[in-house]
């Protein structure tokens, strides 16, 4: 590993720690030549995936697009950025485990829905409404009932008092 300070090629590892549940490794290194310390990160290089859209178009898998969709679904919800990272890592891991170079966008959507369903019902409904293209409130009601939601009894107002 090349030292960022002096350019020497020899450095020794003085500490290693797993990050993100083993998804990456942080290493503290010390340059043999100048003695200065620096940090490097290692991560398995993701497999280059093409996403096959519903209309048949193909585009490269974009983790930023996935993260943005999750951010929008989870906006103003009590969910930490670490949870978003966990979902992104889960999606990437499951897609890579397929061992294929193309994945349907529907598979990505279903993995995200599964993870959101376990995490936050509101975020799940937000994501599902876009992903499943809810046409009307009836679609929304059906999805909410599938989550176990039941409508409240109608409340009548007594106008005589």
Curated annotation (Swiss-Prot):
GO terms for molecular function: ATP binding; DNA binding; zinc ion binding. One of its GO terms (biological process) is negative regulation of DNA-templated transcription. The keyword Cytoplasm does not apply. Keywords: ATP-binding, DNA-binding, Metal-binding, Nucleotide-binding, Repressor, Transcription, Transcription regulation, Zinc, Zinc-finger. Its cofactor is Zn(2+). A zinc finger (unnamed) spans 3-34. Binds 1 zinc ion. It comes from the Bacteria. Residues 49-139 form the ATP-cone domain. Negatively regulates transcription of bacterial ribonucleotide reductase nrd genes and operons by binding to NrdR-boxes. HAMAP family: NrdR. PANTHER family: TRANSCRIPTIONAL REPRESSOR NRDR. Belongs to the NrdR family. NCBIfam families: transcriptional regulator NrdR (TIGR00244). This is Transcriptional repressor NrdR. It comes from Thermomicrobium roseum (strain ATCC 27502 / DSM 5159 / P-2). The gene is nrdR.
